[in-house]
Regions:
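Aromatic-lined carbohydrate-binding/catalytic grooves of carbohydrate-active enzymes
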Residues: 180-257
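A low-complexity, Ser/Thr/Gly/Pro-enriched, surface-exposed linker/loop concept
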Residues: 16-55
């Protein structure tokens, strides 16, 4: 693992880039270098880093960050990281245990969602810093697959990129692996119209696309295929698995159309 690594009996601090630092604390003194469910590649190459260390205190400087650690368990009064730049009214200093307010991330699924939903935290923030907590993820290798960590540990990644959001995303993907490309079939023509089609109207529409020589990769029948005027106790009417037989009297024949 390239970059600067400072390790004690129960802690390890790895400077991955001038703006990205890994913080580990393990009561058993066991640290992980392998892949996890989230992290695949921690090798970013050499990093310019200045370390000032005594038996009690560690100060670490990169071009963009200053880390101060009074050796011992990670606590708010012992460990902080400060960005070298004014990104918030009262400065951009993170103390261990603080939960940064981020610009949020994404949702993995819409299962059981009926209305607004809370997004997970992301790695971008108006304050200039954010956290990725990898402490609870499983370890992974090709031969044995997923397995639990042999020793519980704090395993955090501090992203201190200021307003360099593209840089943060670039290094995030370097750390976690590139997302898969969209499948080729998803890049074709999609047809989706919010309209109460009958099964005959929709079949006629598909026949017209074929007659006009317009290929379709995906065809969406939107939401009127199911009942929408339903009792409130069943939900909002925006979802469901009923069939509106006034519009689609023979669902099986329609689907096999």
């Amino acid at each position: 693992m390239a970059g600067s690594v400072i390790q004690g009996e129960n802690y390890r601090i790895s400077v991955l880039t001038e703006s990205l630092v890994r913080l580990e604390y393990s009561e058993g003194g066991v640290f992980e270098d392998g892949q996890t469910q989230v992290v695949q590649n921690r090798d970013f190459g050499p990093v310019a880093c200045e370390v000032v260390e005594t038996e009690e205190v560690l100060d670490l400087h990169t071009e963009h960050l200053h880390l101060h650690f009074e050796k011992g368990p990670f606590t708010p009064d012992r460990l902080f990281i400060e960005l070298k730049g004014q990104y918030a009214v009262y400065g951009s200093r993170w103390h261990y245990g603080d939960q940064p307010e981020t610009l949020k991330g994404t949702s993995r699924t819409l299962d059981e969602v009926d209305g607004a939903m809370e997004l997970e935290d992301g790695i971008l923030s108006k304050a200039g810093y954010a956290l990725l907590d990898d402490s609870s993820s499983y370890l992974y290798d090709v031969e044995s697959g997923f397995r639990a960590r042999p020793c519980p540990e704090v395993d955090l990644y501090f992203f201190g990129y200021g307003r360099d959001y593209l840089g943060a995303l670039k290094d995030f993907y370097h750390l976690t692996g590139q997302p898969p490309l969209l499948p080729r079939y998803a890049l074709g023509n999609w047809w989706s119209r919010y309209w109460p089609y009958t099964s005959q109207e929709y079949t006629d529409l598909m026949d017209r696309f074929k007659a006009e020589g317009v290929p379709l990769a995906v065809s969406v029948i939107d939401m009127d295929w199911h009942k929408t005027a339903i009792p409130a106790r069943f939900g909002s009417g925006w979802t469901g698995y009923s069939w509106n037989r006034d519009l689609i009297p023979d669902p099986a024949a329609f689907l096999h159309g």
